[in-house]
Amino acid sequence: MPEKLGVFCVLEQKEKYQILKEIMKEGESPEECMARTVGSEDSAPFSWKARGILTLVREDKPAEYVFLFRAWQPAPEDRKEETDTVCWTKCDEILQNLAGEEEKICFRFLLEKGPFFSLKVTFDRRNILRSATVNGKPLELFDILKEDGSPAGIVRERGVAHLDGSLHPTSHIWIVRKNHSSGWDLLLQKRSLSKDSNPGCYDISSAGHVSAGDTYLPAALRELGEELGIRAEEKDLHLAGMRKAYFEDVFYGKPFRDYEISAVYVYDKPVDEEKLVLQESEVEAVKWMDFQECCRRVEHGGMKHCIYMDELEIVERYLEKRKDREQ
């Protein structure tokens, strides 16, 4: 028998939760361990479903294997018992109280509907998250930031960061060209309908998260290449400013909390939109729009978008300073 086998169960009662964890006894099945653990907390009847398995790897330690369950229990008013001995907690409080990043990832996946999954999470010897995969597919990891923008020493999975609103870095690139009306056009991208937030909305020319271990400028160059097929160099991107912003909404029935510090870049090399190679999973289409017209639509309506005026103002200030320097 491996050194450690365990269960991790999310027990739900009317959108409140309890996290139950237990080590399996010799000769005990995962289902028996889960039932024993839930039963020890509350004798009320419950239903359950096996959802996945976690392989937990830490440097210089034996691997751990944890069976993942989701269970449901009726609220006290829906059953004969007058008392409820389990401490029920809302989703946000659960995330704050979970000690390990692997538990946060498990909780995030167990909240979602889907087939049985295999999750593997690896930590380095400093106990910092190094990698996470689900069914063999890598999950995106972020470096979490302090309020001043410095690293917090925490690496977090993308879905968890967007569930609890952790501050993380992103790179935004605005592609511009000169025109004869307001002075500049902006290239807008229309987000893919498959995006986990703001699907089908017009957005920044190119934008993306800064992966764990990466920095703003390399991330910006990578996003330009991946989303639009533009192979740029560091000298082609001009830093217009930094922006901190928080956005919260519900998409596909799930809360989405995006708290980010963004490096805002301007790219002014010639771009033929007809020759761009769009990443279908990210970008549905692109279009040029006059800068002032874009500002009017963002401020007063007229297009479905997820663009913010304060970021357009950052770009505008940069372009005005550049114009002054060129005169």
Where does each model-flagged region fall?
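Residue-level signal for short segments within beta-strands and strand-turn junctions
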Residues: 11-13, 73, 146, 175-177, ...
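Well-ordered beta-strand positions enriched in small/hydrophobic/aromatic, beta-favoring residues
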Residues: 9, 67-69, 86, 173, ...
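A generic fold-level signal
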Residues: 2-4, 12, 61-63, 81, ...
